[in-house]
């Protein structure tokens, strides 16, 4: 019995740490698959980030999953029509962090109408911008996920093939902005070995 091993019944004490799990996908091995997530997609594994702050835990999980998060540079915005209004506030946050905005025509018009400074990227030059490292981060929520002939599919696949982080959801983008704003204010996170977490938890629990 568990009691004979020294375990007591009931719930464990709440930890001072937050753990965030992130899925890992094998997009690099599947050349015709869109990176825009859909309900039928399955991850090939999971990783976990742990920290006292949930934003840092997310940051660690994303890094472990292979998603590099740049601290600056050019962010390319290519969203669906339904996302453009919400994208304005998000773009302002990117600008405050020092990112330079780049956008396809419809997004560019929407951003400039809102008073934001953004560079217009011609549609026939978008993939070249990604391939030549002129873009540090991509936000692509174009519709018709999985359709090879669509611009959104081409942007997402090219970003993946050239190791440019590509976000396909405004919720994810906002969460990553929370992380970047926290790191800008508080600096780099602490890194612990796994056994150090249990010792810290007992000491501070």
Predicted segments with their positions:
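ATP-dependent carboxylate/acyl-activation modules
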Residues: 1-167, 173-176, 182, 186-189, ...
């Amino acid at each position: 019995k568990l009691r004979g091993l020294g375990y007591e019944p009931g719930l464990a004490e709440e930890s001072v740490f937050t753990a965030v799990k992130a899925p890992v996908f094998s997009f690099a091995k599947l050349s015709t698959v869109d990176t825009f997530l859909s309900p039928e997609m399955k991850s090939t594994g999971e990783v976990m980030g742990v920290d006292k702050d949930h934003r840092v835990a997310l940051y660690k999980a994303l890094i472990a999953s292979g998603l590099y998060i740049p601290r600056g540079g050019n962010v390319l915005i290519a969203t669906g029509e339904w996302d453009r209004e919400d994208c304005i506030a998000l773009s302002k946050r990117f600008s405050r962090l020092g990112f330079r905005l780049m956008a396809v025509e419809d997004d560019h018009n929407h951003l400039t109408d809102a008073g934001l400074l953004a560079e217009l990227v011609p549609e026939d030059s978008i993939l070249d911008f990604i391939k030549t490292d002129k873009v540090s981060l991509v936000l692509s929520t174009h519709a018709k996920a999985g359709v090879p002939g669509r611009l959104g599919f081409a942007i997402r696949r090219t970003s993946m093939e050239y190791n440019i982080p590509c976000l396909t959801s405004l919720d994810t983008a906002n969460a990553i902005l929370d992380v970047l704003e926290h790191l800008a204010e508080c600096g780099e996170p602490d890194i612990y070995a796994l056994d150090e977490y249990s010792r810290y938890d007992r000491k501070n629990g």
